[in-house]
Regions:
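N-terminal regions immediately upstream of nucleotidyltransferase
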Residues: 1-74, 92
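Flexible, active-site-adjacent loop/turn segments at secondary-structure boundaries
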Residues: 47, 82, 87-93, 145, ...
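Catalytic metal-binding acidic patch
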Residues: 77-112, 120-122
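Residue-identity detector for glycine
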Residues: 35, 43, 52, 82-87, ...
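Detector for Asparagine
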Residues: 16, 42, 106-108, 150
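Conserved catalytic core of two-metal-ion nucleotidyltransferases
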Residues: 54-62, 68, 108-166
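Short, intrinsically disordered, charge-balanced linker/junction segments flanking boundaries
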Residues: 171-176
Length: 176
């Protein structure tokens, strides 16, 4: 898939036309899935498909993020967690995302996040998500080993690198 071309076509879209955005992005999701299926049928090994799916999804989410969050007025980081955080994305797997906030979201951020998640669902991506501040990550990690493990395997997709680094530091095994 030609991601620079997709980004340009998305930027050229009428920002008020959800149908046009959904059509473009849904076609990209189908192209990615069909391409990976075809590679597998032609003898490509499973690991290449699983890691390739994650990398292609990373690129797609990055484009959607840059498109959807142009008017963002808060510091956030979009983070892959779970198997997706490890860079593994099996067919039909959920795409587990954590949206890390520097502070509680304001109404603008809340609206943008809602639009972002709705768009991901509308284009056929199965999204599992959480929205947390660093303090909430620390609290949840202390209470729930699955959250701690997810955060240990987390990787930054897009957004504020310093915020991500602070979260990783405060939720490291030495601090939990």
């Amino acid at each position: 898939i030609d991601f620079p071309s997709l980004k340009k076509r998305l930027d050229d879209c009428d920002h008020n036309s959800c149908a046009e955005q959904i059509k473009l992005l849904k076609a990209a999701v189908i192209t990615i899935a069909d391409g990976l299926k075809e590679r597998y049928r032609n003898g490509c090994d499973v690991d290449t498909v699983v890691y390739g799916r994650a990398k292609l999804t990373d690129q797609l989410i990055d484009i959607i993020y840059s498109y959807q969050f142009k008017d963002l007025d808060q510091v956030i980081a979009l983070i892959a967690v779970g198997g997706y955080g490890r860079g593994e994305l099996h067919p039909k797997s959920d795409i587990d995302l954590m949206i890390l906030l520097q502070e509680e979201e304001n109404q603008n951020t809340k609206d943008l996040l809602e639009k972002f998640l709705m768009l991901l669902w509308d284009i056929g991506l199965e999204i599992g998500h959480s929205v947390r501040t660093i303090e909430e990550c620390v609290d949840e990690s202390t209470r729930d080993i699955t959250v701690a493990t997810n955060i240990m395997e987390a990787r930054l997709l897009v957004g504020d690198e310093k915020l991500f680094a602070q979260m990783k530091e405060k939720t490291s095994p030495e601090h939990i």
